[in-house]
């Protein structure tokens, strides 16, 4: 069966289109129930995709006026090559220290963590240790709403819905979409409870680079 394209709900079609969704203003809902209803409809209409959520206090636009979702390592109004190199050096140093600490304290999963950089980066990103090339998302609407309202003194908040390919492993690499999807619940040791409370996932591209022109 051919994979279908993204389908919007009737209400969303009256507000925007697939082509313009990134540049249009968000679809306003007044209640949590309204949000859940839209999510339920989107999930039903888009069976070929798994829905993930991200909550933010603000909608960050690029120069073209479109919503953007940059990993922390690439975020800056003006990011120089020198700063980017520094951030990657800091990431590699933090990864090495994390692996050493796991080994020292005999944390479960230490052997695999030392071998796989994406596991190292996922833990560093989720616990906000340093900038990484990954973005936090969740399968919980409630968690996304909580993050959208965290330290938010405005009257509005933003919850984004992403339709991503179904994951097949703990670390799923989709070469067709150049996408990595990491299920935190499956890679973090049981001592790390935050991913279980937040139903956390990390997503990024397989082609991770510190080349400024390609960021």
Where are these regions (language model features)?
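Catalytic-core elements of nucleic-acid end-processing and repair enzymes
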Residues: 1-215
């Amino acid at each position: 069966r051919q994979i279908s394209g993204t389908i919007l709900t009737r209400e969303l079609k009256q507000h925007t289109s697939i082509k313009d969704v990134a540049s249009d203003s968000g679809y306003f809902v007044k209640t949590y129930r309204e949000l859940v209803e839209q999510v339920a409809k989107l999930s039903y209409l888009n069976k070929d995709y798994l829905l993930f959520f991200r909550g933010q206090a603000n909608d960050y636009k690029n120069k073209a006026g479109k919503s953007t979702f940059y990993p922390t390592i690439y975020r800056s109004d003006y990011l120089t090559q020198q700063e980017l190199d520094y951030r990657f050096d800091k990431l590699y140093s933090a990864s090495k220290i994390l692996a050493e600490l796991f080994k020292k304290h005999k944390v479960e999963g230490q052997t695999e963590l030392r071998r796989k950089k994406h596991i190292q980066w996922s833990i560093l990103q989720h616990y906000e240790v340093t900038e990484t090339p990954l973005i936090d998302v969740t399968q919980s609407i409630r968690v996304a709403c909580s993050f959208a309202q965290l330290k938010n003194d405005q009257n509005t908040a933003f919850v984004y819905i992403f339709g991503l390919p179904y994951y097949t492993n703990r670390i799923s690499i989709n070469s067709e979409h150049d996408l990595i999807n990491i299920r935190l619940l499956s890679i973090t040791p049981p001592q790390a409870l935050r991913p279980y409370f937040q139903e956390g996932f990390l997503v990024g591209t397989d082609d991770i680079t510190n080349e400024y022109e390609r960021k």
